[in-house]
């Protein structure tokens, strides 16, 4: 799910079986139709409350939603949408870096995790450009390089 077609195209190229436009009014219904009743897992990196709610609503019973991006302040979730489901906040992948980082490097070496296609490097002096590119959808994950 994304708002930018080039990101959806990249997802298909990297192995996604379905892509959906995040602006669709019936987004949750589309996920339920594709998955036969809701996803087992959903994952939100935006921290946008409406998107976070959709990520939870897209789950089937016993589904798990992982939230990476969050905003400061309170978040309202429909209590009924949470019944029978799990919502977890994720920090640094909720993994042991001593194990996880070497594993990700191995995946990259095997061609299974092409993170180099998901990032764009910016010198620290271009921090504003990096943020703008991220917000406009031009860059999936900007990486700032210290001078």
Indicate residue ranges for each PLM-predicted region.
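Adenosine-nucleotide cofactor-binding segment
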Residues: 1-54
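Short, hinge-like loop/turn segments at secondary-structure boundaries
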Residues: 15-20, 29, 37, 82-86, ...
